[in-house]
Regions:
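Beta-lactam-recognizing serine transpeptidase/beta-lactamase-like catalytic domain environment
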Residues: 3-171
Length: 171
């Protein structure tokens, strides 16, 4: 949603039509409810998680722009949290992202992300589009109770600008 709002490819109150499914090549993609919603705004499509609308919006963005935002939100790379064993997740290479892959990635399939990446990307929206490095440690104290180290917020990158982030918060 934020990528499409940032790129002016969709507006919150723009009306879409959902027939309950969309054909992409030889695949039929349905909504999770398997029912059509008819006419609905983008805002309502986000609220109801309407797969077919996300497919339409991803097609407006295109694979290259869609991938740019996936990476901007930290998917496909480690967050840098201070614990071992963190996974990067799995994202199709751009060269292998066809129409079907783009369509299914638009609503969260054909992509593998970690719970920490998901939380961090949602936090980026709440932080006015800034993707921050997550941490488990706020501060370190010595045995007398003195703070010897305080973790400062570290911005990894801007995922989207503040205006689209606030629009997503309003959805």
């Amino acid at each position: 949603a934020s990528a499409a709002l940032e790129e002016d490819k969709v507006f919150a109150d723009e009306v879409f039509y959902d027939s309950g499914y969309v054909k992409i090549k030889d695949r039929t993609i349905k909504n999770w409810t398997s029912r059509p919603y008819g006419s609905l705004t983008f805002r309502k499509a986000v609220e109801e998680s309407v797969n077919t609308v996300f497919v339409q919006v991803a097609n407006r963005l295109g694979a290259e722009t869609f991938r740019k935002y996936i990476e901007a939100f930290g998917y496909g790379s480690k967050t840098g949290i201070e614990i071992p064993g963190e996974a990067e997740g799995i994202i199709y290479p751009l060269s292998k992202t066809g129409e079907v892959e783009l369509a299914t990635m638009s609503f969260g399939q054909s992509i593998s992300v970690t719970p920490l990446q998901m939380i961090n990307s949602v936090a980026a929206i709440a932080n006015e589009g800034k993707l921050l490095k997550p941490t488990l440690i706020k501060e370190i104290w010595d045995y007398k109770g003195n703070i010897i180290h305080r973790h400062e917020k570290e911005e990894v990158k801007a995922s989207v600008s503040p205006l689209p982030a606030s629009k997503v918060m309003d959805l």
